[in-house]
């Protein structure tokens, strides 16, 4: 048994303008080559674009989009007796949010468009409405888990 103490789970800090943890999680995922100020610029521009498009609170649109994309269940590759099975596992809320943010950013990067702020705002608005690539990715993951339900006992 280990003598070391258990590490305390870190909580996500909130961003300086909106005081929102989700915004900060988005900033940290969009970050490339340590350019955090550029990541903040992209997020804040996309939030302004969401405000212009929907004429509602952009943070509620962001919350709704992330809630819509967050998966409840995922599949994990598990090797049993020489063959690899896709085993469905339940996902916690923190891990689900992280996956949702990753999928949203991936879908926005794939979109055709002018700049990242425009693409991200479009993807967030679509996800809040229940369409878009990120929502499709969630549904595909749920379908995979449902198809491999027979292997659930391999956890």
Curated annotation (Swiss-Prot):
<dbReference type="InterPro" id="IPR020606">
    <property type="entry name" value="Ribosomal_uS7_CS"/>
</dbReference>
<keyword id="KW-0687">Ribonucleoprotein</keyword>
<dbReference type="GO" id="GO:0005840">
    <property type="term" value="C:ribosome"/>
</dbReference>
<keyword id="KW-0699">rRNA-binding</keyword>
<keyword id="KW-0694">RNA-binding</keyword>
<dbReference type="GO" id="GO:0015935">
    <property type="term" value="C:small ribosomal subunit"/>
</dbReference>
<dbReference type="GO" id="GO:0000028">
    <property type="term" value="P:ribosomal small subunit assembly"/>
</dbReference>
<dbReference type="GO" id="GO:0009507">
    <property type="term" value="C:chloroplast"/>
</dbReference>
<protein>
    <recommendedName>
        <fullName>Small ribosomal subunit protein uS7cz/uS7cy</fullName>
    </recommendedName>
</protein>
<dbReference type="Pfam" id="PF00177">
    <property type="entry name" value="Ribosomal_S7"/>
</dbReference>
<dbReference type="GO" id="GO:0003735">
    <property type="term" value="F:structural constituent of ribosome"/>
</dbReference>
<dbReference type="GO" id="GO:0006412">
    <property type="term" value="P:translation"/>
</dbReference>
<keyword id="KW-0150">Chloroplast</keyword>
<dbReference type="InterPro" id="IPR000235">
    <property type="entry name" value="Ribosomal_uS7"/>
</dbReference>
<keyword id="KW-0934">Plastid</keyword>
<dbReference type="InterPro" id="IPR005717">
    <property type="entry name" value="Ribosomal_uS7_bac/org-type"/>
</dbReference>
<dbReference type="GO" id="GO:0003729">
    <property type="term" value="F:mRNA binding"/>
</dbReference>
<comment type="subunit">
    <text>Part of the 30S ribosomal subunit.</text>
</comment>
<keyword id="KW-0689">Ribosomal protein</keyword>
<dbReference type="InterPro" id="IPR036823">
    <property type="entry name" value="Ribosomal_uS7_dom_sf"/>
</dbReference>
<comment type="similarity">
    <text>Belongs to the universal ribosomal protein uS7 family.</text>
</comment>
<comment type="function">
    <text>One of the primary rRNA binding proteins, it binds directly to 16S rRNA where it nucleates assembly of the head domain of the 30S subunit.</text>
</comment>
<dbReference type="GO" id="GO:0019843">
    <property type="term" value="F:rRNA binding"/>
</dbReference>
<dbReference type="InterPro" id="IPR023798">
    <property type="entry name" value="Ribosomal_uS7_dom"/>
</dbReference>
């Amino acid at each position: 048994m280990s003598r070391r103490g258990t590490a305390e789970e870190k909580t996500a800090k909130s961003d300086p303008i909106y005081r929102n943890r989700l915004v900060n999680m988005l900033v940290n995922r969009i970050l490339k080559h340590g350019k955090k100020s550029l990541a903040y610029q992209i997020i804040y521009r996309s939030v302004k674009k969401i405000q212009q498009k929907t004429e509602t609170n952009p943070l509620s649109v962001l919350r709704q989009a992330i809630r819509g994309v967050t998966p409840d269940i995922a599949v994990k590759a598990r090797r049993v007796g020489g063959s690899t099975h896709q085993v469905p596992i339940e996902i916690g809320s923190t891990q689900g949010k992280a996956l949702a943010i990753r999928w949203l950013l991936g879908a926005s990067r794939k979109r055709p468009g002018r700049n990242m702020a425009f693409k991200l705002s479009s993807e967030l608005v679509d996800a809040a409405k229940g369409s878009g690539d990120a929502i499709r990715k969630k549904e595909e993951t749920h379908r995979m888990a449902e198809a491999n339900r027979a292997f659930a006992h391999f956890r």
